[in-house]
Amino acid sequence: ASEGNGRGPYVQADLAYAAERITHDYPEQTAPKKAQLSTVSDYFRNIRTHSIHPRVSVGYDFGGWRIAADYARYRKWNNSKYSVSIKELGRNDNSTSNSSHLNIKTQKTEHQENGTFHATSSLGLSAIYDFKLNDKFKPYIGVRVAYGHVKHQVRSVESETTTVTTHNGAPVPQGPTPKPAYHKSRSISSLGFGAVAGVGIDITPKLTLDAGYRYHNWGRLENTRFKTHEASLGVRYRF
C-alpha cells in the first residue's frame, strides 16, 4: 500500500491517442441560407482524424479524491482536396445534304480546397475519485474543465473552362475563369467540459501505472464544434 494512505502531491506523464471529431456548420444549398452559400464541400464539414501527443499533469492526492491540472498540445490537422467535373452544355448538329457538322460545348469545373484545424493547447483541471478495490488496483472516474485554444482555416477555389469542339477542328477552350475564392480563418479560446475514467495500478508505494480514457467537448468556434476521445497510458509519481 502507499505510504501515508496515498496522500500527497504527485506528477504524471502520459502518452495519449486522440480521436478528433471536427464538425463545421457551413451554409447549405437551401433557403434561407442560400445567399450565404460557400463552396466548402462535405469533406471539410465533418472531419474524422486522430493524433498522438504527450500530456503532463500535477496534482494532489487526498487519499480517495484527487485534483489535477494538466497541459497538452495537439497535432495540426492539414489536408486538401481537388475535384473536377465535366458537363455538356449543348450541341449543334449543322447537317446539309452533303455533310454533317457537329459542334459540342462542354464546361469543366475545377475545385481546390485546403483546410487546417489545430487545437494548439489545452490547460485542464480535473476532480477524480479513486475506488480502492485492493492494495494494487484503483479504478477511477472524474470530471474535467479545460481552457483550450483552437485555430481553424479553410480556403475553397473554383474555376470554370468552357470548350467548344467542332467537327473538323481542335477543341477551342475559353478560360479558365476563376470564381471568387471562399476563405475563412478563425482563432479563439474557449472553456470546455468533459469526463475522465481509468484504472491505476500501484507498481511501488510511490509509482502508479495509469491507463485512462477521457472525453472532452471543446465547445464552439463560431460555426465549428470540436470534440476529442482520448486513450492514454502513463505513470504517476507521488512525492
Curated annotation (Swiss-Prot):
Annotated Polar residues bias: 92-106
Species, as recorded: Neisseria gonorrhoeae
Alphabetic keyword roster: Cell outer membrane, Membrane, Signal, Transmembrane, Transmembrane beta strand
Compartments, as annotated in UniProt: Cell outer membrane
N-terminal signal peptide: 1
Gene Ontology molecular function terms on file: porin activity
Record family assignment: Belongs to the opacity porin family.
GO cellular component, one term: cell outer membrane
Gene that this sequence comes from: opaA
GO biological process: symbiont-mediated suppression of host pro-inflammatory cytokine signaling
A Pfam family that the UniProt record links to this protein: Opacity
Source taxon at top rank: Bacteria
SUPFAM superfamilies documented for this protein: OMPA-like (SSF56925)
Ranges where the record places region Disordered: 90-112, 160-184
Name of this chain's protein: Opacity protein opA53
